[in-house]
């Protein structure tokens, strides 16, 4: 068992590292369509409000623009450049999925001012991250491992994958609840499993989704268990029912006396004045997004399932339940229309 006594802990005075994902995970909520000017407005407001890092890219990471994931209104580079022009204090961050983005894209993002990257894999496929984590370290970047759909791996197995990412050079590894399926006990078990195997100097992060209305609660539990890096977004802007909303989480952090650098009112203003008006579909818990969490479905599948439901005259929930039963993971969005067609044919029999 790895010694954990010296691990920094928010309950003992360690400062939280608040990573905003409005301009990455939030891209799913806008179908990856936002002008560079709006990116700059959001990034500038976040920088002024004191977040530690701002993640910018297509919702599926660098080079995620495709028919499978959804084309963006602009390139990653246009969005990153817009943010880089106005971010003066926070770390400009991006996301990379090996097999979607390449080392070449990572190097170009670094040249544009990105100094931190999260390398994301499915929760059982950490081994594919070695090259990208290694390259990020060679560039001198802050680098985290991002184990998506963490609910699909038992705590000990997930921790073993986290240990692999640590061995490749990750400064931090996240419990990433992409489906918004984890409950408080499930989060607690996974963070404790990480603590058991990771070096005390390796940070632990939490990325929560709101599909079961547990994102703030899950994040609080994670911090209580030793997490210091927290993902959140303005107005919860993100895939499915959204991410952990940054404003209420910071309010709760204040009530607990946890250290952070954020201005609560500044975050509230940015959420209500800039982000909410951009939403063409409310980012909230409703019958469709709740089904994502209930069935343990990748949150970014929401818009794809809604489109298929409209095309084939189906209930989106039926599609999402079928997706969950088949165990689809990120990158298999193109199978959703096939599932919808099967459901339609079954109804006609």
Swiss-Prot record:
InterPro entries, alphabetized: 2-IPM_HCS-like, 4OH_2_O-val_aldolase, Aldolase_TIM, DmpG_comm, DRE_TIM_HOA, PYR_CT
UniProt: substrate binding residues: 24-25, 178, 207, 298
PROSITE patterns hit by this protein: PYR_CT (PS50991)
A matching Pfam family: HMGL-like
Keywords noted in UniProt: Aromatic hydrocarbons catabolism, Lyase, Manganese, Metal-binding, Plasmid
EC number from the UniProt entry: 4.1.3.39
Origin superkingdom: Bacteria
GO biological-process terms attached to the record: catabolic process; L-leucine biosynthetic process
Active site as annotated: 28 (proton acceptor)
Record-linked PANTHER family: 2-ISOPROPYLMALATE SYNTHASE 1, CHLOROPLASTIC-RELATED, HOMOCITRATE SYNTHASE-RELATED
Official protein name in the record: 4-hydroxy-2-oxovalerate aldolase 2
Species whose genome carries this gene: Mycobacterium sp. (strain KMS)
């Amino acid at each position: 068992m790895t010694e954990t006594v010296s691990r920094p802990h928010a309950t003992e005075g360690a400062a939280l590292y608040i990573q905003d994902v409005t301009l990455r995970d939030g891209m799913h909520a806008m179908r990856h369509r936002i002008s560079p000017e709006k990116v700059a407005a959001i990034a500038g407001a976040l920088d002024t409000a004191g977040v530690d890092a701002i993640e910018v890219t297509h919702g599926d990471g660098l080079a995620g623009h495709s028919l499978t994931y959804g084309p963006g209104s602009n390139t990653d580079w246009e969005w990153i450049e817009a943010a880089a022009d106005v971010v003066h204090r926070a770390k400009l961050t991006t996301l990379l999925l090996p097999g979607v983005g390449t080392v070449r894209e990572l190097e170009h993002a670094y040249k544009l001012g990105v100094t931190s990257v999260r390398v994301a894999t499915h929760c059982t496929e950490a081994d594919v991250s070695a090259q990208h984590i290694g390259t990020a370290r060679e560039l001198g970047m802050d680098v985290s491992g991002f184990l998506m759909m963490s609910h699909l791996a038992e705590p000990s197995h997930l921790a073993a994958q986290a240990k692999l990412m640590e061995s490749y050079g990750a400064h931090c590894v996240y419990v990433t609840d992409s489906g918004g399926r984890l409950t408080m006990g499930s989060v607690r078990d996974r963070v404790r499993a990480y603590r058991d195997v990771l070096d005390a100097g390796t940070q632990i992060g939490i990325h929560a989704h709101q599909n079961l209305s547990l994102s703030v609660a899950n994040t609080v539990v994670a911090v209580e268990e030793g997490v210091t890096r927290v993902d959140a977004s303005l107005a919860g802007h993100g895939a499915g029912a959204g991410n952990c909303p940054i404003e209420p989480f910071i309010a709760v952090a204040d009530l607990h006396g946890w250290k952070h650098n954020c201005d609560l009112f500044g975050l509230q203003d940015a959420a209500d004045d800039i982000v909410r008006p951009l939403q063409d579909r409310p980012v909230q818990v409703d019958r469709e997004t709740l089904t994502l969490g209930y069935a343990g479905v990748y949150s970014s599948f929401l818009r794809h399932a809604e489109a298929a439901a409209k095309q084939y005259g189906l209930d989106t929930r039926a599609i999402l339940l079928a997706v969950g039963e088949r165990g689809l993971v990120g990158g298999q969005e193109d199978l959703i229309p096939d599932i919808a067609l099967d459901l339609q044919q079954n109804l006609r029999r």
